[in-house]
A protein has these predicted regions:
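Aromatic-rich, lipid-facing transmembrane alpha helices and their immediate juxtamembrane interface loops
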Residues: 2-153
């Protein structure tokens, strides 16, 4: 159920819409957290002990859109995890490239990899494959894990 702030009317959301919205928010927040941890670990490599991590508001819907992959994740679980991880990494590269091009077109892209080796048009870094491999498996787990039942005691 959802109550509209503008009209005060009650609007009923079906279970799938509610699940998708919850997963979108969960993925957006998880993605932000992963990005902040990753960028702060890069600061550590540069010996910047402030460990400052960064992200962008634009990244929330990009990470949140991982929720769209839940049905795909459920079907892929029969494959071995190395195969799934590779497929997910390639899908993330594709999503990163497409979203990066769109954001670049509007001069809003928060990342620029042109100064790094193994970049493609400054939008994706092929050396990030292991990170995207792990991230894909992380989001699979996040979106397919059954909620734990609360014990009464």
């Amino acid at each position: 159920m959802y109550i509209s702030c503008r009209t005060g009317h009650t609007v009923f959301m079906n279970h799938k819409s509610n699940l998708y919205l919850n997963n979108f928010i969960k993925c957006g927040i998880a993605g932000w957290c992963l990005e902040i941890l990753f960028t702060s670990s890069m600061a550590l490599r540069r010996r910047e002990m402030t460990l400052k991590g960064t992200t962008s508001i634009w990244m929330f819907p990009l990470y949140g859109s991982m929720a769209l992959l839940r049905p795909f994740f459920l079907r892929m679980q029969k494959l071995a995890f190395p195969v799934r991880g590779c497929i997910y990494a390639l899908m993330i590269f594709a999503g990163e490239f497409l979203s990066g091009r769109l954001l670049q077109k509007h001069q809003l892209c928060p990342w620029d990899y042109t100064s790094h080796h193994w970049n493609i048009q400054g939008i994706i870094r092929l050396d990030f494959f292991p990170y995207w491999f792990a991230t894909g498996l992380f989001f699979e787990k996040l979106l397919t894990e059954k909620p734990s039942s609360q014990s009464k005691g």
